[in-house]
Amino acid sequence: MNEQPYLSVVVPLYNEEGNVRDLHQKIVEALQKIGRPFEVIFVDDGSRDKTLEMCRGLSPLRLVAFRKNFGQMAAFDAGIKAATGEIIITLDGDPQNDPADIPLLLAKMDEGYDVVSGWRFKRKDPFMKRFFSRTANLLRGMLVKDGIHDSGCSLKAYKRECFKEIDLFGEMHRFMPALLALDGFRVS
């Protein structure tokens, strides 16, 4: 891949040895169908299992590795800073996000949006976690009115310029679409 990537997919990983190879394959398959130059960036957030070892030899892959666990947002930040694509896609390293949904995000971006957020429609979390998440999303949606169903879903697509306007910290990936909407970006 010598072309400048159009798409950069950034995935933070923490103790995902059982998922990482299958996830990489699904990402590459989804991106190859799009037919645009891409890069895949995995950020190992100080995993204590064999995640880092399982990443070795995967191609195409750019790997960023932390010596210790700094948290998901720090991993997203490192991956986004390493990304060179015009469109940056984020998703979790666990199987909650299906890379096959990436083309759906891009189709929405083709409608003129700057940020498109995914939705974990069939979440595999315990009932109470889903309940509190849905309640928080409902309250946030009533306050911000951004139309986002699942702000905690890490599957999102952003135009590169979005990250020139915002400093990443804490758990803010949940609130980035709302903050960017307040800055005038088109969010879906």
Where do the protein language model's features map onto the residues?
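Short beta-strand/loop segment that forms part of the nucleotide-sugar
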Residues: 24, 28, 36-46, 64
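A conserved acidic beta->alpha catalytic loop
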Residues: 44-52, 95-96
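Catalytic metal- and UDP-sugar-binding loop of GT-A-like glycosyltransferases, i.e.
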Residues: 66, 91-93
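Acceptor/aglycone-binding surface of glycosyltransferases and processive sugar-polymer synthases
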Residues: 62-68, 72-82, 99-182
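Short, well-formed alpha-helical segments that are part of the catalytic scaffolds
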Residues: 16-31
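Cell-envelope/extracellular polymer assembly enzymes that use nucleotide-activated donors
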Residues: 6-8, 39
